[in-house]
């Protein structure tokens, strides 16, 4: 029952995977930036004149943590062609969370209209901490407070308790109702990546907190609920564990099954990069394992998250790329070169949350009167990367 847009995106990603071209993606590419707030809504737009070819949002943008109706109303006027229509719908919605879901879907539609492919991850709250709001006037998800950041709160046996009969099943279903409402408002396909990095143990859905069967059961339940009960037919389901698997067999251990997954991937970050380190070698090995698995199962494949991760620098809350003296200025090109020979269609780096909050692409700090851009030291290598014939950005995909 997949929509035409899903079939088109699937065929496109499959085709790109067979070439030596690679789509460059970024989380929150049009809603968070490290560069000047006087320029566009996107650091890559400032640096190279395009949004990224894949743009990720998270459930945190649906619940008001990373994006909100207020932000849409204040930032998208004059930018989004359908602003007036969206603003009217936001103003008519009765609860704040419904307004936020409308805004997140509108941002996604803006990204799609500008040539990007959408993906949605879920940093879900720990459902043992979710409180009821007492609001029973409208949609189920208005009855719960899903805000805050608790995916790394590891108590509560949450994976078992969100299944039918469990203590948190009703709250989990309400959360999925919110995801479904978002899906129904998106005009196009969404690569939906729930319960990611499940082979590590830093989220409550991680390997230490549920057995293989429970993980598979929760993943299948999620797909069946959205697809069969909520009639969501514009999702492509992405299984995106960490990079722990040392073999195809190990990669398969928590895989939910071919009937529940359209794309497989992995998340792998380059920690404290140095010239001559083994990251690209290890990354290529992991990509080969995932690619082999994908070919055996007839699935799409991608690098679902990557980026550089440095020890937190003085004055920073989080450090991804360094502000200066990065040892691998051509990092984005290095990853493109590692991915291009595989069947992977894209790689996605994480969000530019701010200069002190972690950024994964260079950015512009100011533009001089003569048009000269001043900013992060990796701008020139990134412009070269953008200009490669085989790097794909949104501008290359726009109809």
Please name every model-derived segment.
Residues 1-61:
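Boundary/entry segment of secreted carbohydrate-active catalytic domains
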Residues 18-29, 36, 299-399:
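Substrate-binding cleft of secreted/luminal carbohydrate-active enzymes
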Residues 55-57, 251-280, 350:
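Aromatic- and acid-rich polysaccharide-binding/catalytic face
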Residues 39-42, 239-267, 314-323:
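Substrate-binding cleft/loops of secretory-pathway carbohydrate-active enzymes
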Residues 26-27, 193-196, 219-249, 298-311, ...:
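Aromatic-lined carbohydrate-recognition surfaces of secreted/lumenal glycan-active proteins
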Residues 21-23, 54-56, 115-121, 189-193, ...:
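Structural preference for beta-strand elements that scaffold enzyme active sites
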Residues 8, 35-44, 103-105, 243-255, ...:
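Alpha-helical scaffolding within the catalytic cores
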Residues 67, 72-228, 232:
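Substrate-binding cleft of extracellular glycoside hydrolase catalytic domains
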């Amino acid at each position: 029952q997949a929509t035409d847009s899903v079939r088109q995106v699937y065929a496109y990603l499959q085709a790109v995977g067979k070439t030596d071209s690679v789509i460059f993606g970024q989380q929150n590419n049009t809603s968070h930036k490290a560069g000047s707030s006087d320029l566009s809504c996107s650091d890559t737009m400032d640096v190279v004149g395009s949004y990224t070819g894949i743009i990720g949002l998270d459930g945190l943008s649906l619940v008001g943590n990373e994006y909100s109706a207020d932000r849409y109303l204040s930032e998208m006027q004059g930018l989004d062609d359908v602003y007036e229509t969206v603003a009217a719908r936001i103003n008519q919605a009765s609860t704040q969370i419904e307004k936020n879901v409308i805004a997140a879907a509108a941002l996604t539609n803006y990204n799609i209209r500008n040539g990007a492919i959408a993906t949605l991850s879920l940093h879900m709250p720990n459902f043992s901490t979710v409180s009821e709001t007492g609001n029973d006037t409208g949609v189920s998800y208005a009855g719960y407070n899903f805000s805050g950041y608790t995916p790394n709160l590891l108590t509560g046996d949450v994976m078992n308790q969100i299944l039918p009969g469990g203590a948190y099943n009703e709250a989990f279903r309400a959360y999925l109702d919110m995801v479904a409402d978002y899906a129904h408002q998106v005009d196009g396909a969404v690569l939906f990546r729930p319960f990611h990095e499940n082979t590590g143990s830093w989220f409550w859905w991680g390997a230490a907190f549920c057995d293989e069967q429970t993980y598979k059961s929760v993943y299948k339940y999620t797909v069946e609920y959205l697809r069969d009960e909520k009639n969501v037919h514009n999702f492509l389901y992405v299984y995106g564990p960490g990079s722990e698997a040392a073999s195809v067999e190990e990669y398969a251990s928590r895989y939910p099954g071919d009937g529940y997954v359209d794309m497989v991937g992995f998340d792998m970050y380059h920690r404290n990069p140095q010239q001559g380190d083994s990251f690209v070698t290890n990354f290529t090995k992991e990509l080969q394992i995932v690619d082999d698995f994908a070919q055996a199962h007839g699935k799409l494949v991608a690098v679902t998250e990557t980026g550089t991760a440095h020890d937190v620098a003085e004055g920073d809350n989080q450090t991804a790329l360094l502000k200066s003296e990065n040892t691998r200025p051509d990092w984005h090109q290095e990853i493109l070169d590692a991915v291009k020979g595989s069947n992977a269609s894209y790689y996605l780096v994480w969000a530019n949350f701010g200069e002190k909050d972690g950024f994964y692409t260079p950015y512009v700090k100011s533009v001089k009167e003569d048009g000269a851009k001043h900013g992060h030291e990796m701008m020139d290598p990134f412009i070269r990367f953008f200009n490669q014939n085989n790097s794909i950005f949104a501008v290359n995909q726009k109809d």
